[in-house]
Every structure is written in structure tokens, then in C-alpha cells.
Amino acid sequence: MNNILMGKVAVITGATGGLGACIAVKLIEEGCDLRLISSQLGKVETFARRLKDQYPERSIEHYGADFRNLVAVQDLIQLLRSKVDATILINCAGVFPIKDISHSTVADYDHCFDVNVRAPFLLSQGLAENMKKIGWGRIVNLGSSSSYNGSKDTGLYCASKHALLGLSRSLHQELKEFNIRVFCVSPGSIQTDMGKTDTRQDFSNFLRPEEVAEYIVFIIKFDNELISDELRLNRVIVQ
């Protein structure tokens, strides 16, 4: 069977997070070249160097970006579009503010929506133009089970992920005629550093980032006409 991912360029935001790093590893194992983006420049440099040592035949580049900075995001998109035709975009970067709406500020709102919604919107908009020219593309937006459920402690996060779900649905309708598939993957809590900040649940029952990444790579690879544009992933817990 031909590997449709061989040689394709994947842009991954939040590439140094627990889930983003797992997705990067699985995609490079499939033969993808990588463009790794993180707000932690030193960390993404180290990660990219490690992958280059393991996969010297693959092209790997890394970029630091603060998604709260609109100009920085726009400059990054221009850079990505000018250098290579990326056909896979994984919007994995996110923030998880734990604060009820009553005590949230406009600054809290802006920070949450700038990272969780505006950045995926701009990146999807910018990179989709190249995907249209090529006639193939995959965009994966990392949502959350909070897209469907409210929470008294994480209201802004829930709202931002619900907005991302709506954005994904609209992009799917807009881009499907160009053979660009848009997915919103909405997992429950994951065993990452971000997941550790949620002390309301049992961390041992959280999803493992490796298994979520495996799902994501599967839907990117699946090239038949059957499609699941929304995926809700949760752990089966047997008492």
C-alpha cells in the first residue's frame, strides 16, 4: 500500500506540548517533513535537533511564535507560505485558563481566544490557499470535550473550544470541494502538563497523548471518500 504521507510537509503548532510532540513523532515516522512551531523557542530547538538526529533524511524546521501577537502570527504565515507548500496543518497549540467567568477579565478573554481560536483561523486561512493549488490538504483542529460541555471553572476555555468547533465545521464545508479535509478532534482530558493543571479529575484516567496522536494520524492518512469530520475521544472506564 502506498503511503500518501511520504514527503508531505506538516505544520504543527504546540509542537513541544505532550500531544503536539507525539503527533510530530508519528508523522515523521510516516515520512512527513516537519515545520514545528512553539512559544518555547529553546524547547522546540532541542526537540527539532533530536528528531533530525533520528531522521536525518527528513526536512525539519522550527519556529518560535507568540500566538498572542497578531503581527508575529501573520509574519509566520507569510514565511511558511513562501518557503514550501505545506499540505498538513495541525493546530495543537492552546491555553487552558482555570477561572470562572465571574472573575475573568477582558485580558483573560483575549489571551484565550487569541491562542485557541484566532491563531487556528489565521493559519488555516493562510495555508489553505496553498492546499487549494495542490488539490490536497488536511487541517486538524484540536478541540476538546469542553466544546460540547460547559464548566463552571473553565468557562472561557469551553467557549473558545466551542468557537473552534464552529470554525472547523465551516472550514469543512468551504474547503471540501478542493479535496481539503478539515477535522475537529475533541478529546477528553489528556495526560500532559496542561492536563496536570486540572486537579478536578483522576489523572490516571486521562487519555494518553500517544493514543490520541495515533487517531489523528489515522484520519489524516485515510484517503477514501468516507470521512468523520468530528471525533470525540474519551476513555472507557470500567468500575
Briefly describe each language-model feature range.
Residues 100-101, 108-110:
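Substrate-binding pocket helix/loop in short-chain dehydrogenase/reductase
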Residues 144:
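Residue(s) in the substrate-gating loop at a strand-loop-helix junction
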Residues 92-97:
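Conserved NAD(P)H cofactor-binding loop of Rossmann-fold oxidoreductase domains
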Residues 177-180, 184, 201-239:
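C-terminal helical subdomain
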Residues 124, 160:
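Active-site helix of classical SDR
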Residues 16-17:
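Conserved glycine-rich cofactor-binding loop
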Residues 30-47:
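Conserved glycine-rich Rossmann-like NAD(P)H-binding loop of the short-chain dehydrogenase/reductase
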